[in-house]
């Protein structure tokens, strides 16, 4: 069977488990919005993990609260959806409870624990300022780190990610990071991080509880760490980030709770669902047209700062 999943660390761990226990033999990385917009053709030969639900798939695993809210599917699907820290945890729990997989899946427990930490952003200051091992590897796979936009590596980011599920089954993080294609990215991260911090400060403003990061119109954003902003603005408890979408056809707006000041009560998945996106309580994203982006951002800031978390508008289009 084929697995459809995201190309972030959580999706990669889902892939490692499902391939490692013999459920899938092919892996395809797709964007969640393409799934929502029915741009991905699926069949009963497909397993979907860490992505929106598609009714004609064989099995589906997810943990995003927006999907629970959107579909009311618990108990009505082949697979599982749970509001836990990672989709990898959902996959692990499902097969741990089922023979003949209950024993073989146990070898992935440590990896799933790491996926929980990564996807729920339970990082320390040391993890962000000096990432190593199982912290550095997820940052390399994070789409927000901008590795995919740098075209001077020996192999593309997609080619690199295709190798990772098998590597996660057999090697430690340090062994993986010592491989040339990964070491190349570690070097690039260390080279770019100071420039990224400078550009981040130049393009960030504070709006009450929120850090607003606006990278729209920037042709080059250095490789960086999306959690750095929380250390630069420790009094704020949530970030709102705007970047150009693919081929500048739309604006992607991402929201995330601070990992330093964990006082935000905004349900980000619920909020972004109202704009055609999704996520879980602490993080999520949506895509809106350029003409609507400023209005959407201001509306989100009003919701965040007025604590009016039940309000959102459906007036906005995704693409111009």
Which ranges hold each PLM region?
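Active-site loops and adjacent core secondary-structure elements that bind or stabilize anionic groups
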Residues: 200
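Short, surface-exposed loop/turn motifs that are enriched in glycine and acidic residues
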Residues: 182-190
């Amino acid at each position: 069977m084929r697995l459809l999943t995201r190309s972030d660390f959580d999706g990669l761990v889902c892939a490692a488990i499902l391939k490692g226990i013999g459920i899938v033999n092919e892996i395809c990385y797709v964007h969640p919005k393409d799934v929502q917009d029915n741009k991905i053709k699926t069949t009963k030969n497909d397993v979907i993990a860490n992505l929106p639900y598609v009714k004609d798939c064989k099995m589906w695993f997810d943990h995003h609260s927006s999907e629970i809210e959107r579909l009311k599917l618990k108990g009505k699907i082949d697979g599982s959806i749970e509001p836990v820290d990672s989709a990898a945890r959902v996959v692990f729990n499902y097969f741990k409870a089922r023979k003949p997989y209950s024993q073989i899946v146990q070898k992935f427990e440590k990896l799933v624990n790491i996926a929980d930490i990564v996807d729920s952003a339970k990082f320390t200051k040391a993890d962000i300022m000096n990432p190593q091992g199982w912290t550095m590897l997820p940052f390399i796979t994070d789409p927000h780190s901008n590795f995919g936009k740098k075209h001077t590596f020996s192999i593309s980011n997609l080619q690199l990610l295709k190798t990772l599920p098998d590597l996660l089954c057999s090697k430690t993080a340090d062994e993986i990071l010592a491989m040339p294609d990964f070491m190349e990215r570690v070097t690039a991260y260390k080279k770019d991080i100071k420039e990224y911090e400078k550009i981040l400060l130049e393009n960030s403003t504070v709006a009450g509880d929120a850090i607003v990061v606006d990278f729209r119109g920037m042709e080059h954003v250095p490789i960086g760490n999306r959690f750095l902003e929380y250390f630069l603005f420790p009094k704020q408890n949530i970030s709102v980030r705007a970047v150009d979408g693919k081929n500048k056809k739309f604006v992607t707006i991402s929201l995330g709770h601070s990992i330093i000041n964990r006082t935000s009560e905004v349900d980000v998945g619920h909020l972004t669902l109202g704009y055609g996106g999704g996520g879980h309580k602490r993080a999520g994203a949506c895509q809106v047209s350029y003409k609507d982006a400023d209005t959407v951002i201001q509306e989100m800031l009003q919701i965040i700062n007025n604590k009016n978390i039940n309000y959102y508008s459906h007036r906005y289009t995704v693409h111009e």
